[in-house]
UniProtKB/Swiss-Prot annotation:
CDD domains: ACSBG_like (cd05933). The gene is ACSBG2. Belongs to the ATP-dependent AMP-binding enzyme family. Bubblegum subfamily. Gene3D superfamilies: N-terminal domain of ligase-like. The keyword Ligase applies. One of its GO terms (cellular component) is endoplasmic reticulum. Keywords: ATP-binding, Cytoplasm, Fatty acid metabolism, Ligase, Lipid metabolism, Nucleotide-binding. One of its GO terms (molecular function) is long-chain fatty acid-CoA ligase activity. This is Long-chain-fatty-acid--CoA ligase ACSBG2. Residues 62-78 have a biased composition (Polar residues).
């Protein structure tokens, strides 16, 4: 990684040649006029053009680089027009010099290499129904022809709303083949949010899973969408027939009279530097932004990520993955759709209630070789394992404790370059680790990943102690998914790894500790935000660097560490910048009964915290209940509390539990770098955060603006007293709220003074 001045000058310094190959069989070409190539440490921009009509003319237009001249070169590395073209960023050698390809070209290669291998597997009536890569491609081709029959216009959206399924994949890729834009919509979106996305991408077609979505969302907004032409329902048969509404079976038959040549002509006109997919951001602070991803964004990133992650091609050993994360998210699309197509992996679809409790059942049945879990998924597995462990015999618990100690120490040594395998580790592997992996379905999994949100060190160490290293990935929608990856050979706890081959990283305006904004460059950088020029200019600077909005640093070995979000930084009234995540994680680690923690105090005189307790989630609705988890109950019992419900703790102001929380907060405060970073007040909320409640996003990421608005009155009460606590006893007294009780919730900490807490802890 270069310093900022070197990095910027490198990107701005062109060199004269691109090393690219052109497929002689009529695939997309690359125009030299559309290329700006920089030195090997910098970037190159590339795009392709339509094949020439006359092969002789085509050859005459080639120069010594093997690139065709273009009459209409792309003029910039970004665009905001859905039919726009961009310069692709290529290197003169290495991973960044790979020839640009369209989605169709990559899929054709997959069929050629992996045609008879299984690609997709979904459960029908309790049995796995599988499609080979040839069958998968044929269905995408049929879907594309049916989209053309429905008069899908070039660069107009096909919105897909539903849980992961073969139909979701086929609709997505079929839309791209047909020249449209594949657009995922979160199933949790309101009709208003669905309308915004569909209108923003000029959607022609809406593909939904079931009758509920068709009626409550699509039909409610259909009349407001001038470009809408049809609604397709794939998860169940139509309950009532409406004009321009089709079942999945009817839809696939629609295009039978569309000649293959018509679709082939559209496919051959596609270029790697054109948009094919839109990923909509969550829009927690405004309307969602449509992240435009090109063919090259998807195809290049998938091969770069796969090689960096050491994925195996199916011809060597087929990778197996479980699809369950929302496909509207770029991480799920890259892991579930594009990486498998590129490397011939087999995708198994989990049940729709996977995140409500059935995921582990699917993992045990499939036994994947690679698995991506967002932090909340890993935390839930951790909680479940701890709950089961708590019910074991004393002997089993002692053996497990010993094995975890051995596992953590051995893996930490491996992480730092040691290679020996101690005898006690081998014994622990036979007695504990193998059984644990089998119990959660990860006994064949050599690649366990986490991403999309910060994960705590405690959770990483828990799995590491069981010989399950969880490797962090880091990126964003605007980088087509991953930018950095962790692998067994390059792994550090709390680091998100090293940049992928062909990618570059810049720490913008680093402070004395080397912490600054993380910026990206490479072929994975998005085209722009659809119809949002100013937002695009804010994201991509004049030198072509994508500003992530994340704060971080890079160590001497090239490992990148994320320290917080610029927008999430709490700036106190005294002007001190406070990253909330490390403080929140520290409180959760210090007090095992805490489920979620959110620090507040922006522009305020001191910090305060909202807390929730670990409770059992309703497997049907996904809503947090009142019953404490087994782990939480065990923790209460150790404290001397008989509580088994959240409401019992809150209504009685359970002294043992509240004192333990305060002790944890005090312990965290002792490690604070300044008084401004100490938690002065806290409150326990009556209900845990959830996707349904709006506090968590589809990937379980905390939506701070939503929480802040939802609990605005309560947060305001934190600061109702204008005086900032200054002494230890005054601070503690402030934490206890002086016995006041608010009407909004009944969980305000009100134990009284510091001495009162100490007496409880001493019992």
């Amino acid at each position: 990684m270069l310093c900022e001045s070197e990095a910027r000058s490198t990107l701005a310094d062109p060199v004269p040649m691109a090393y690219l190959s052109v497929d002689a069989q009529g695939s997309s070409e690359v125009s030299l006029d559309d290329i700006t190539i920089n030195s090997s440490a910098g970037t190159v921009e590339v795009c392709s053009m339509k094949p020439a009509d006359d092969p002789k003319t085509e050859r005459s237009q080639m120069n010594k680089t093997g690139l065709a001249s273009s009459s209409r070169p792309a003029s910039n590395v970004w665009t905001t027009q859905q039919d726009g073209e961009v310069k692709l960023r290529m290197d003169e050698e290495g991973m960044g010099s790979e020839a640009p390809k369209t989605v169709h070209e990559v899929f054709q290669e997959a069929v050629s290499k992996y045609g008879d291998y299984y690609a997709l597997a979904s459960k029908k009536n309790g049995q796995w129904v599988k499609l080979t890569y040839k069958m998968y491609y044929d269905k995408c081709w049929k879907a594309a022809k049916s989209f053309l029959k429905l008069v899908l216009e070039r660069f107009h959206g096909v919105c897909i709303l539903g849980f992961n399924s073969p139909e979701w994949f086929i609709a997505d890729i079929g839309a791209i083949f047909a020249g449209g834009l594949a657009v995922g919509i979160y199933t949790t979106n309101s009709p208003e949010a669905c309308h915004y996305v569909a209108e923003n991408c000029s959607a022609n077609i809406l593909v939904v899973e079931n009758h509920t979505q068709a009626c409550r969302k699509s039909l409610e907004i259909e009349h407001k969408l001038p470009h809408m032409k049809a609604i397709i329902q794939y998860g169940e048969e139509l309950k009532e027939k409406r004009p321009n509404q089709y079942s999945w079976r009817e839809f696939l038959d629609l295009g039978e009279d569309i000649p293959d040549s018509q679709l082939r002509e559209i496919i051959e006109s596609q270029k790697p530097n054109q948009c094919c997919t839109l990923i909509y951001t969550s829009g927690t602070t405004g309307q969602p932004k449509g992240v435009m991803l090109s063919h090259d964004n998807l195809t290049w990133t998938s091969i770069a990520a796969g090689r960096s992650l050491m994925l195996l091609e199916a011809t060597e050993k087929q990778e197996l993955v479980v699809s369950y994360l929302p496909l509207s998210h770029v991480a799920a699309q890259m892991i579930d759709i594009w990486l498998p197509v590129t490397f011939g992996g087999q995708v198994f679809f989990a049940q729709p209630d996977a995140l409500k409790g059935t995921l582990v059942d699917t993992l045990r049945e499939v036994r994947p070789t690679a698995f991506l879990g967002v932090p909340r998924v890993w935390e839930k597995i951790e909680e479940k394992m701890k709950s089961v462990g708590a019910k074991s015999s004393t002997l089993r618990r002692k053996v497990a404790s010993w094995a975890k100690g051995v596992g953590l120490q051995t893996n930490l040594k491996w992480m730092n370059g040691h290679s020996e395998v101690p005898m006690n580790f081998r014994l622990a592997r036979q007695l504990v680790y193998k059984k644990v992996r089998k119990a959660i379905g990860l006994d064949r999994c050599t690649k366990c990943f986490t991403g999309a949100a910060p994960i705590s060190r405690e959770t990483l160490e828990f799995f590491l102690s069981l010989n399950i290293p969880v490797f962090e990935l880091y990126g964003m929608s605007e980088s087509s998914g991953p930018h950095t990856v962790s692998i067994p050979q390059a792994f550090r706890l709390t680091s998100c790894g090293k940049e992928m081959a062909g990618c570059r990283t810049l720490i913008h305006k680093p402070d004395a500790d080397g912490i600054g904004e993380i910026c990206f460059a490479g072929r994975h950088i998005f085209m722009g935000y659809l119809n949002m020029e100013e937002k695009t200019k804010e994201a991509i600077d004049k030198d072509g660097w994508l500003h992530s909005g994340d704060l971080g640093k890079c160590d001497k070995d090239g490992f990148i560490y994320i320290t917080g979000r610029i927008k999430e930084l709490i700036i106190t009234a005294g002007g001190e910048n406070v990253p909330p995540v490390p403080i929140e994680d520290a409180v959760k680690e210090a007090c095992p009964i805490i489920s979620n923690a959110m620090l507040v105090g922006d522009k305020a005189k001191f910090l305060a915290m909202l807390l929730t307790l670990k409770c059992i989630i309703n497997t049907e609705s996904g809503e947090p209940g009142d019953d404490l988890t087994a782990e939480a109950i065990e923790y209460c019992q150790k404290l001397g509390s008989k509580a088994t419900k959240v409401s019992e703790i809150i209504s009685s102001k359970d002294k043992a539990v509240y004192a333990a929380i305060q002790a944890a907060v005090s312990e965290v405060n002792k490690r604070a770098v300044s008084n401004a970073q100490k938690i002065q007040k806290w409150v326990v909320l009556e209900k845990d955060f959830s996707v349904g409640g709006g506090e968590l996003g589809p990937t379980m990421k905390l939506k701070r603006p939503v929480v802040a608005q939802k609990y605005k009155d309560l947060i305001d009460e934190f600061y109702a007293d204008a005086n900032t606590p200054t002494t230890t006893e005054e601070r503690t007294s402030a934490v206890m709220w002086g016995g006041r009780k608010l009407p909004l919730v009944h969980s305000i900490v009100s134990l009284g003074s510091l001495q009162q807490i100490q007496r409880v802890l001493q019992k």
